Amino acid sequence: MAATGEALTPQGYIQHHLTNLQVCATDNGLAVNHACEKAGFWTWHIDSLFFSVGLGVLFLWIFRSVGKKATSGVPGKLQCFVEMIVEFVNNSVKESFHGRNALIAPLALTIFVWVFMMNFMDMIPVDWLPHAASLMGIPYLKAVPTTDVNITFSLAIGVFLLIIFYSIKVKGVSGFVKELTLQPFNHKAMIPVNLLLETVTLIAKPISLALRLFGNLYAGELIFILIALMYGTNLLLSTLGVTLQLGWLIFHILVITLQAFIFMMLTIVYLSMAHEDH
């Protein structure tokens, strides 16, 4: 639904739900959305930033509160749930990470829970939050941060920088350079080929991390929007639409959990490889 309340065409409805609330600086001051078409890189997706940061703060608050109140006696339901997640992530790290680094488990826990919480926003019916925002004069609102490629690439670039950092820290600058130039063919004549292959492999890691998460969540959100569009026109079709939405919702719970798990596991594996001194 548009902020002004006018009826949207099917194409407009889809486009509206897939458009972020954008803010940019222009010669005339701050501008939003259509006025930001020429701003390029310096356009801020306010909704993605709000929900991603907000969910991150919520995650830290919940886990910190549970940690402070944890007792050796009979735990409450929330404490049991948090302990189950922590144990699951800790076991995943033990199985996949072969170096020694006390920061990997907390990092993996943060990635898994944070990405899952951002993905879980996809469970909210597609019209609820945009409609509530339109009542407050906000023309666009995209509530699922991981359907914004800027967010997924930000996460992936963070992981990429950690890969570079730990590769240099563990192997040294010379060791890192040798890894790029003397593998997989250990001969000086093959240095250009090795450098090309290893550079492509290295750069492919964050790109695959970002696009996999973005693609799966974007497609899932689009299916929710299409179901709402096709079956929301009358009462009879709405009944069928609710059934389809519920079916896709149940399946999508698996998707959002799996994508958070994959992002976490690949991060662990990549950092484990960075700690391996060849």
Swiss-Prot record:
GO cellular component: plasma membrane; proton-transporting ATP synthase complex
Subcellular localization, as worded in the UniProt entry: Cell inner membrane
This protein's record includes keyword Oxidoreductase: no
Topology in the lipid bilayer: Multi-pass membrane protein
Gene3D superfamilies per UniProt: ATP synthase, F0 complex, subunit A
Xref: Pfam families: ATP-synt_A (PF00119)
InterPro entries on file: ATP_syn_F0_a_bact/chloroplast (IPR045082), ATP_synth_F0_asu (IPR000568), ATP_synth_F0_asu_AS (IPR023011), F0_ATP_A_sf (IPR035908)
Principal localisation: membrane
GO biological process, any: proton motive force-driven plasma membrane ATP synthesis
Keywords: ATP synthesis, Cell inner membrane, Cell membrane, CF(0), Hydrogen ion transport, Ion transport, Membrane, Transmembrane, Transmembrane helix, Transport
Cited function: Key component of the proton channel; it plays a direct role in the translocation of protons across the membrane.
Subunit structure: F-type ATPases have 2 components, CF(1) - the catalytic core - and CF(0) - the membrane proton channel. CF(1) has five subunits: alpha(3), beta(3), gamma(1), delta(1), epsilon(1). CF(0) has three main subunits: a(1), b(2) and c(9-12). The alpha and beta chains form an alternating ring which encloses part of the gamma chain. CF(1) is attached to CF(0) by a central stalk formed by the gamma and epsilon chains, while a peripheral stalk is formed by the delta and b chains.
Stated name of the protein: ATP synthase subunit a
Protein's gene: atpB
